């Protein structure tokens, strides 16, 4: 009986703590959350993100932000953005990735309330600013940005990209 009670208590505490936000659809983070998105909005954003990454040719090298990686996992070259934008090919040469896919909506959604998301967003913003010369926007859809290496910018995507970057939350720690 004692062991059954201990197991029951550990399951209750483990599931109610919502590890890594995996149960957020079922267990809210709070009664009155600072950022809320309905399941329908989440579904629409997911569909937009998948449609955006489908514009990247299948055999291209990609650097993607964390929420997009599972959808691109079958790629021969897939690295995590913002930590890497270059990879070493089979010949031992360093190569820039052809495409970058970033879900800015995901990273900015909780940036005001969660320090981890705020740090990730700042790192992403800094890296994106440094890539303006090499990469140009090809598509911006519901906060998902697709950038291509050494190509002519899509004017509509470039404008949407600049607007999106300006709308991102500003890091309060840097201003003080």
Put a short name on every predicted segment.
Residues 29-71, 76-176:
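C-terminal luminal/periplasmic domains and tails of membrane-associated envelope-modifying transferases
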Residues 1-26:
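Signature aromatic-anchored transmembrane alpha helix within multi-pass, membrane-resident enzymes
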